[in-house]
Amino acid sequence: MTAVSGDNPNSLFATPAIVADRRGDGSILVRSTTPLQESARCIGDWLEHWARQAPDRIFLGERASVETPWSTVSYRDALGIVRQAASWVLSQGLSAERPLVILSDNGIDHALFALSAQHVGVPSAAISPAYSLMSRDFDKLKSTIELLDPGAIYVASTKPFAAALAAIKPLHRAVIVSGNPEDADALAFPAIAATPESPDVAKAFAAVTPDTIAKFLFTSGSTGTPKAVINTQRMLTSSQQAKAQTWTFLEQPGAELVILDWLPWSHTFGANHNFNLVLRNGGTLYIDGGKPAPGLFATSLANLRSVVPTVYFNVPRGFDMLIAALRTDDELRRKFFEGAKFAFYAGAALPQNLWDALEELSLQAVGHRLPMVSAWGSTETSPLATDCHFLAKRSGNIGVPIPGTELKLVPSGDKLEVRVRGPNVTPGYWKAPDLTAAAFDDEGFYKIGDAVTFADPEWPDLGLFFDGRVAEDFKLNSGTWVSVGTLRVAGIAALAPLAQDIVVTGHGRDHVRFLVFPNLAACRSLAGLPESADTREAIGHP
C-alpha cells in the first residue's frame, strides 16, 4: 500500500512512494518504487565536472580562528592540486594494500590529499584524531596502522601528534606528511601539492571503476577493535544519487548549497553524507573549527554569524546548544532562519523538546516552521539507507528507504530487526573474511543490529522510527556509542565493593547514568553502621 503525505514540501523533496511486502516467514520487505538512476563512475567525476562548470566557485573554506578571514579553495584550484598530489601518490606506489592514512581533523589539505589518492584509485583512511590525541596506550591507533600498512600518513602538524607517531613508528614503513611546512621531521604537503602533474594521473583516473575502493572508514570500536569498513566508489556515488532523487531542490536551477559543518571526516556522517553532498552538487563547505562541546561551541556560533548555511546539519547535542544561543541572540536567530531551507539531525534521536523549541524559534524569526528532517544508516551503508524527505509529525522519524535500497524487517522478540541491501552497502570488512561473512544473512542483507517500527503499518510512506538496538548498546545525543557491557563491568569495578550491579542508561541523552543496586553489607561497613541498619540509612549515610 502506498500513501502520499499531504505535508510534503514539494519545493524541496520528492514525494515518497514506498511498498511493504509481507512474506510468509514473517519478514517484511520495504522499498521505494522509484528506481535509482545511473550514478557517477567515481567521486572524481564530480570534481572534474564542477571544475569545468563552476571553476571559480568556492569548494572549501576554513579559518585558523574566528578572528581571521576564511581561506578558501575553488573547484578549479582544488582539481589542480588533486591532480598534482596524485602524481606524488602514484610515484610512491600507494595502493589499497598501502593506502593513505590521515590522523588529523578536518581541513582543506586533509580533503585535497584524500581526494588526490581517491582520484587515482588509492584508498584513503581518516582515523579518529582521538586515537592519537586522547589515548595513553594508542591501542586503537596501533591496530588500525597494523591492519592498513599505510604508504603515507598525514598530520596537519607533527607536534600535537608526536607521541602518537612515536608509538606507531615500529609498525609501519610510511612517509610522514605534514601540512605545516616548518615541520622538519616530515615531508610538507605544500611540496606534494606542487608536484608536476604526471601523464600517469589521467591513465589511473580512467582506470577507476565503481568497484574501486575509495576509502576505509573505521567502526567506533565500542564493542572491541575497530573494523575497517570498505567503502567503494559505487557505495559513495549511489548514495548521493539517491539523495539527489529525494532532495530534489539540489538539481533545481539556481539552487545554492552552502553548509557549515564540524562533523568529523573519520566518521560516515561528516565524510560520506555531508562532504560528498557538497562535492556531488557543486556546493560550498565551510569547515567549522568548533563543535558541540564545552568551550568549543562559541567558535561554531561565531562561524554561524559569518557564514549563513542553506542546510544545517548537527547531532542533537549541537541543536541543544544552538537553541540556547538562538533564544538570546536576535540577529543570529534572524540570519539563521532566513538562510536555512531546513535542518537535518542524525547520529542519535532528537528529543521532542528540542524539536518543539526549534519550531517555536523559527516561527518567531520568520513566521513559519523550519522543516526538520533526518535519515538513518551506518558506516556500512555509506551511510544513507533511509531518508525522511517529508515533513514528519514529530521527532524521531528516520524516513523511508532511499531509491535502490531494500530493507528487510525480521521479527526478533517483540522488535523488528532491520537489515539493508543495496549498492550503498559495503562488500565487507578489510582483511576480515569471518567478520564479513557474519555481517550478512543468506539473502545478502547487511545485519546492522538496529530495530525499527512503522509510523503507521498501513501507510509505509509515513516512515519508520528507530526502536533501539537488538543488542544492548546505545548512542548518546552526541552520536557517541556507549558500550554497555564494558561500561557496566568498569563501573562495578570502580565502585567496588559498594555496587552489586549496575544498569547503564542514557539512550538519546547527553550523558550516561547508572542505576546502581547497592551491596548493602559493604555500604553498612563503610559507614560504620550495624548490620541492623535499614537500606535508606545505609545508602544515605554521608
Residue locations for each model-derived region?
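Conserved AMP-binding/adenylate-forming core of the ANL superfamily
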Residues: 35, 59-115, 132-142, 193-197, ...
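Structural core segment of the AMP-binding/adenylate-forming
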Residues: 2-11, 119-192
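Gly/Ser/Thr-rich phosphate-binding loop
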Residues: 281-283, 301, 310-313, 323-395, ...
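Conserved pre-ATP/AMP-binding loop-to-beta segment of ANL
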Residues: 55-58, 176-178, 185, 191-218, ...
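Conserved structural elements of the adenylate-forming
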Residues: 79, 83-85, 195-201, 210, ...
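Conserved AMP-binding/adenylation subdomain of ANL enzymes
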Residues: 237-258, 265-332
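Conserved AMP-binding A3 loop
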Residues: 71-76, 205-206, 214-241
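Conserved ATP-binding/catalytic segment of the ANL
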Residues: 416-476
